[in-house]
Amino acid sequence: MFYLCIRLITKHMDEITKIETVDQYDQLFGLETLHPLVNVIDFSKATRSVEYIRMNIGFYCLFLKDAKCGDLTYGRKNYDYQEGTVVCMAPGQVSGIDNRNRPAPRTKSIGVLFHPDLIRGTSLGQHIKNYTFFSYEVNEALHLSDQEREIVTDCIHKIRIELEHPIDKHSKQLIVRNIELLLDYCMRFYERQFITRNQANKDIIVKFEQLLDEYFQNQVAITEGLPSVKYFADKACLSPNYFGDLIKKETGKTAQEYIQCRIIELAKERILEGVQTVSQVAYELGFQYPQHFSRLF
């Protein structure tokens, strides 16, 4: 019997195993490798179970949890992977499987693994950074409607069909295009998720504005310098990419642009007051050099 649950892993825990290739991952679960650089995996067909492992992966992963996975540990909070949840990970990220002290039901989860070498030199390779959800935290997973789940499942199925087809000159292009289509759908569904969580998002915007004002009112900029997107994302308990995408969706500006606009507003206010010199204003707003401040205008 096999049970899969991806967990956020804290740094103080034990050894990390490097899983560099798709085949190494397949071997963990006794699954067939259809291609050295890409595979569609069906965990219900796993012939081996993994009780516990922490791993640093060398490829992209997209998992569709098609059955309840149980509790996901994130910091000190627990989250449930409900049916129809998509979780994505990028090369270099650390994830884990922990089946200790819990029953192990067979999961219906499926996934796509693809190595960066597969997409190198392709359109997808050039634009992979646009799929920012690969850098979202695990508690920022995508929750699908029934119709969306059918679409994602169909995309994964088409990749599987192409992998099972005898290799010819069209194989790589079709595989990569189908992966790109899958990711485009996930991007669309994430945007829908942002919209359906509109009120929660607006609360985050209000908190962001409050923290941004406090950053300068409390003169944090003098010691810490210019505020970063990561600073505010951490305060909101979100990953920088998820936070940035949320701000962009709600305001039409990137989080960095939003911060810069606020700095410009404050700078104009303080300069027009005539109490401080330009250099003093620049210093209090976090600029190390006044000439960098001047470039804002």
What is the meaning of each model-derived region?
Residues R76-A90:
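Short acidic-glycine-tyrosine-enriched beta hairpin
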Residues P166-Q173, M187-Y231, K249-T254:
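Short, Lys/Arg-enriched, Trp-marked, Pro/Gly-tolerant hinge/linker segments that flank
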Residues K230, N241, T277-S279, P290-Q291:
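Residues within helix-turn-helix
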Residues R100-I167:
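A hydrophobic/aromatic-rich effector-binding and dimerization subdomain
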Residues G84, F243, H292-F293, F297:
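Short hydrophobic/aromatic patch on the recognition helix
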Residues D71-T73, S95-A104:
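Short beta-strand His + acidic residue motifs that chelate non-heme Fe in jelly-roll/DSBH
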